[in-house]
From Swiss-Prot:
Signal peptide: none annotated. This is 110 kDa antigen. It comes from Plasmodium knowlesi. Keywords: Malaria, Repeat. Residues 133-296 are annotated as: Disordered.
Length: 296
């Protein structure tokens, strides 16, 4: 058994122990050789050979056992040292790895914050771009709507703000036909008030300016039969009285029924504005009253 095979992987203490064992084995071999070479009695030596062989076998077994024990001890120590060294390295590496992981986690959080900021900035840019696009697309529509909505308002305001001079000029330039139509469309309340406020002189003139044709027709439409019957049945005395009483009434009526020549002259002298107003405001009631008063 050669113990030099283990020297490459054994510590110094184990190496010194193994060298001492080798020295002991060499000494034993040396003494054996000298014993066999010496001039001692061969019988004693031969008798002892059997014992020596047994002792050598025992020594070999002992050495083998010792070597095995030493090897086991050395290997166990080596295993323990290696394991301890490995564990130390592992623990150191783990601690270092924890620091590295902690640093990496901090870096990751910073990266996440940066990414969030970038996303927010991108969203803001997108929003700005969208608003600009919508403003570009909406501006012409709003302009058209505002023009459509502002035009009638401006027209109304301009109509209201028309200078009164222009309105007066337009009123002066209105055709007489429109004036007559407006006079005809005057409300009945105003016509009634105007009729009430008409001076009595004008009413007399209007009565005088009543068409002579109507008065003549009313006189002609008086029933001749009634007049003849009344004249026949009335006594002569009553006829005289009735003639006396009727004469002033008829004279008044005849005054109203002045010849058409005079009425035409009076109509010519009447102002055209008053004639138009009076013709429009004349009610049918005075004609009926005149018809009633004309009857005998």
């Amino acid at each position: 058994f050669n113990s030099n095979m283990l020297r490459g992987s054994v510590c110094e203490e184990d190496v010194s122990l193994m060298t001492s064992i080798d020295n002991m084995i060499e000494e034993i071999d040396f003494y054996e050789k000298e014993i066999y070479k010496g001039s001692h009695s061969g019988g004693v030596i031969k008798g002892m050979d059997y014992d020596l062989e047994d002792d050598e076998n025992d020594e070999d077994e002992m050495t083998e056992q010792m070597v095995e024990e030493v090897a086991d001890h050395i290997t166990q120590d080596m295993i323990d040292e290696v394991a301890h060294h490995v564990l130390d390295n592992i623990t150191h590496d783990m601690a270092h790895m924890e620091e590295i992981v902690h640093g990496l986690s901090g870096d990751v959080t910073q990266i996440k914050e940066i990414v969030q900021k970038v996303n927010v900035a991108v969203e803001k840019v997108k929003h700005i771009v969208e608003t600009e696009e919508t403003q570009k697309t909406v501006e012409p529509e709003q302009i058209e709507e505002t023009q459509n909505t502002v035009e009638p308002e401006q027209t109304e305001e301009t109509q209201k703000t028309v200078e009164p001079e222009q309105t007066e000029e337009t009123q002066n330039t209105v055709e007489p036909e429109q004036i007559e139509e407006t006079q005809k469309t005057v409300e009945p309340e105003q016509t009634e008030e105007a009729q009430k406020t008409v001076e009595p002189e004008q009413t007399e003139e209007t009565q005088k300016t009543v068409e002579p044709e109507q008065t003549e027709e009313t006189q002609k439409t008086v029933e001749p039969e009634q007049t003849e019957e009344t004249q026949k049945t009335v006594e002569p005395e009553q006829t005289e009285e009735t003639q006396k009483t009727v004469e002033p009434e008829q004279t008044e009526e005849t005054q109203k029924t002045v010849e058409p020549e005079q009425t035409e002259e009076t109509q010519k002298t009447v102002e055209p504005e008053q004639t138009e107003e009076t013709q429009n405001t004349v009610e049918p009631e005075p004609t009926q009253e005149t018809q009633n008063t004309v009857e005998p």
